[in-house]
Amino acid sequence: HGAFMGVGAYASAILTMKLGVPFWFALPLSGLVAALVGMFFGIPSLRLKGLYLAIATMAAQFIIQYLMRNADWLTGGSDGMSVRAPSFFGLPLNTDRRYYFLVYALVILATLFTKNLTRSRSGRAFVAIRDRYLSAEVMGVNVWGYRILSFGVSSFMVGVAGSLWAHYVLVISDEHFTIGLSVQYLA
C-alpha cells in the first residue's frame, strides 16, 4: 500500500502543481489514478493467493518505487516535488488543527463508504471470496472481477490518503514510500 499511497501523492502533486488542477478536484482524481494503477498490478496476481500474492504486491512496490525515483521528468526523481497547502473557501489549511478537520471529515466519509460497501452486493462478494474462495466461485460470484475491484477500491482509498499526506507535508520524494511503509501498514 505504500507504493499506491505514493502514486496518489505524486498524482496529486502533478495535477495541482504542473497542470493547475484545484486541490478539491485533484483529491479524488489522485485516488482514481492510484486505483487504476492498483487494478493494473492486480491483473497479473489474480491467480495468486496467500504468500504468493504478498510477494507479487511487493514486486509492485519495488517497480513503482523504481519509477518514482527514475522518472525525473515526471516526479522530480530523488529531489521530489513541492506542493502547496490546500485552502477551503479562501481559508488556507496550513496548520495542524485546520488540516485535522479536513482529514477527520474525509475519514468519516471513508468509514461511511466502507460500511455501506460491506452491505452491498460487492461487499458480500468480497466476504464470500475471502472466506471461501472456491465456494464463491461455484455460487457464480465473478471472483476475478471482484478481486480486481478490491485492488481498485483499496488503492483508491490509499491514493486519497497519499494526496492528503502530500499536501500536508508539502514536499514528497520516493524515500517516503518505501517497503517499510507498506510493512508498517500491514503489521
Please describe what each predicted stretch is:
Residues 1-187:
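Transmembrane alpha-helices and adjacent helix-loop boundaries
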